[in-house]
């Protein structure tokens, strides 16, 4: 007899996801079978792993396989496995909640646009819940491997807010997902349809997928293995089609979109391993959440060891999906052992170089690389600081907007070097809070006049990044808005002995480090310059957001003595009026940098007074 049935409510995020998913993914609904077979495959993988320490688990359940059962009379499709199974607590946790941080933020990003939402939901990973796209009711029967027959569990729900759980006897270990199909999904009871979907999405699954169909007028059941059941990464590259590579990517990533590119490589010699690495087309929603799971699927001698083996790639390549099969590693390897195990460090170094080579090759296709950079550019920039051994290779992958192509983040450092004048001995860049502030910065005026290209950096991590990238191919990187600028003869014409410089310095002594004449400017009256040892605004904000103490900065004010406004200031004798104009000059220089004046109310009062005098 079964124990008393208990009713539970879905976590709020699950109810929302189910509702959105059923409507957004209906046109791509066959993916439910891919998702459920992937889950069954994972369960078989985990059983084989547990059986390394407890071989009896395999002996009790037989060789792992996935079974599909069709019952046209009942209108049900069953996806069953004899894998690891679940306990009652695991059933409630796994089938009633979404244990991923950032879920609420992810759901808030869904727009109601069916096509866009389908991509986002696919990128999030729907897994088991995809069953409700085609089923009006879902029943799950499971027993954890090694548990007694009486400890089976039955879970059931119509996906409308609640589910029931009860303890039932179950002879078989593993899990069976029974889908009571909607009337408009009965085509998934057709043998031909099932073969087609398995062939498209799941042929590469490493365990047999067996279709069982009852025969009319015969008590026997027909069985048919639908997939090749071989580890795709162990096959020669020449025998694997692009469609198979893409299908396998979707299997391991649960992504709906094709990967941008991939690299399949087998290394033989003292250290043997096979890797299959993919670059996704879209960044996961939790890319910047430290606690998010990431890493490669690790196999040893084709035996699954763990998901999310993060020790094989550095943090800045955390978006890479794939498989690593290392037969020389011990089968009982742990995450702790992986961290300091010599062979793992060698594999990590080789895989890192392989990914960078893969991205370098992708960069030859401007259109595809633009897609990649829009999704993962900020993460690649982390590598400039984190991976000094590969810093120059990473720097070659960077892309920038420039003063000559301000609306396109597409210029590489190599392209910059190729187009610069022969006598230019450095790479100039400008930091700004926004792309608009960078494009309109007064600091660019003299560079435009002299035909010198400047990289425009407005990503919040850019200042931190260039702090580590001192040079590229032995050409120094120079901040166009820091320190004194030397572009040739004109820098010698700045007259810092002009009385106006002394008077402005006295008036603004509390607000600025110094006032000096400039050759940076052509059309603007003034600009702010950082001293050589001062933090820029991007770095200040990063430190403040992290709760770090930040020293107070006083900028240097550089003024254009040839500008009519500065020439007008020389004619003001009254100190109070001069001080107001000097303060406004500083305020407008701050605004031109995309910064707010220190005292906006005082700025407004001075502007009102100035406007009143002018009317």
UniProtKB/Swiss-Prot annotation:
Signal peptide: none annotated. Belongs to the heat shock protein 90 family. Its main location: cytoplasm. It comes from Alcanivorax borkumensis (strain ATCC 700651 / DSM 11573 / NCIMB 13689 / SK2). This is Chaperone protein HtpG. Residues 1-335 are annotated as: A. InterPro entries: HATPase_C_sf, Heat_shock_protein_90_CS, HSP90_C, Hsp90_fam, Hsp90_N, Ribosomal_Su5_D2-typ_SF. Residues 542-615 are annotated as: C. The keyword Lyase does not apply. SUPFAM superfamilies: ATPase domain of HSP90 chaperone/DNA topoisomerase II/histidine kinase (SSF55874), HSP90 C-terminal domain (SSF110942), Ribosomal protein S5 domain 2-like (SSF54211). Pfam families: HATPase_c_3 (PF13589), HSP90 (PF00183). Molecular chaperone. Has ATPase activity. Residues 336-541 are annotated as: B. Gene3D superfamilies: 3.30.230.80, 3.40.50.11260, Heat shock protein 90, C-terminal domain (1.20.120.790), Histidine kinase-like ATPase, C-terminal domain (3.30.565.10). The keyword ATP-binding applies. Homodimer.
